[in-house]
Regions:
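RecB-family 4Fe-4S metal-dependent nuclease core
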Residues: 1-348
Length: 348
């Protein structure tokens, strides 16, 4: 692990979005005591997808996570529902929906997914992080991102969410693709909503009301209530069709000039972070505040109420989520050339 100051994609995104958020998360190291369900779901799903792609037993991994979480999962049952059971159901359906030969995973140093990296991108600044996976379809090569969602992002959102293309440069620097170049990003979407449970009518039959659910859930309810599957073929078929709502892979081609443009912007942000870490904490109020972990603190500050009480009640100090991230220290950076066609001299 490098002793030089590090910058990650999450740090850059937070810095650009709201410096107050960055200050809370990466300078004060505040974290919510209770993780929101979407984040908890996404983290666990990432863990078992890693095991799945690497050829291990995802359900064994899920059982380990449940054992480790033990009491915490029990305490959150009323608020989140049985998140472990939901993840198991959704993952098994995902595995059936997308067989392993639906794409070709490109291994890196014998590993199929979750590729950690640490590379000096500016003299004195290290970029670190983790790439979900690399894959190929036909003759095209893609950088893969696992994304869990509550509402599927549309194309208008996806074209704005291009920050992951900075990983293109990292892969080139590391030489993981040889002479090949990426054609774009593969978004591997998985719906995080717990499948709805079909209702049983007074006569013992299954309600035909349309639900967003999955076939295995329908079959389980039918089995538990002694309902013959031949009597509910329409319900099962609808549930099978709804798998498309749960699992989508969308491939977004990326222009090489866009990669250089975003990369150079990332370098500028990295320099800003190193120069101003702990010094700037301007609040940027906007729609993003609705889902920001630190909204309660900012709201209390704006209303003139006790922020210390909010912090003590709802937050704790933790090291950064990525164990390899370190607190940036100011350096005098010298720019590394981002591309042969776009050379800029050093300077912050």
């Amino acid at each position: 692990m490098s002793n030089k100051p590090t910058v990650s994609q999450s740090k850059a995104r937070s810095w650009r979005l709201c410096k107050q958020q960055y200050h809370f998360k990466y300078f004060l190291k505040l974290r919510k005591k209770r993780t929101k369900r979407p984040l908890k779901f996404g983290g666990i799903m990432h863990d078992i997808l890693e095991v799945h792609l690497d050829g291990g037993d995802p359900l064994e991994k899920l059982a380990e996570i449940e054992d480790e979480g033990g009491k915490l999962f029990d305490e959150e049952l009323e608020e989140y529902g049985n998140i472990i059971e939901d993840i198991e159901t959704i993952f098994l359906e995902y595995r059936n929906y997308w067989p392993q030969d639906s794409w070709k995973i490109i291994p890196v140093e014998g590993k199929a997914s979750e590729h950690e990296f640490e590379v000096e991108v500016i003299k004195g600044i290290v970029f670190n992080g983790r790439i979900d996976f690399l894959c190929a379809t036909r003759k095209l090569t893609w950088l893969g991102e696992h994304k869990t969602f509550g509402q599927l992002p549309n194309e208008d959102h996806r074209w704005k969410d291009l920050q992951s293309v900075v990983y293109f440069k990292v892969v080139e620097m590391m030489g993981w693709l040889g002479k090949r170049q990426f054609d774009g990003v593969c978004w591997n979407y998985i719906h995080s909503k717990a499948p709805s449970i079909p209702q049983i009518k007074k006569d013992g039959g299954m309600s035909t009301r349309k639900l967003v659910t999955l076939p295995s859930v329908v079959r389980r309810v039918a089995r538990d209530n002694n309902i013959d599957l031949e009597d509910i073929t329409d319900i099962v078929e609808r549930a099978e069709d709804s798998r498309h709502d749960y699992f989508q892979r969308i491939y977004t081609p990326i222009n090489r000039s866009v990669v250089d443009f975003i990369w150079n912007g990332f370098i500028d942000t990295a320099i800003e972070i190193v120069d101003n870490h702990g010094k700037q904490s301007q609040m940027h109020v906007g729609k993003h505040c609705d889902w920001c972990d630190y909204e309660p603190i900012c709201r209390a500050k704006m209303l003139g109420t006790d922020t210390d009480f909010i912090i003590e009640r709802e937050y704790e100090v933790k090291e950064n989520d990525n164990a390899k991230e370190e607190t940036p220290k100011k350096v005098t950076p010298k720019r590394v050339v981002a591309s042969k066609k776009n050379t800029r001299k050093s300077g912050a």
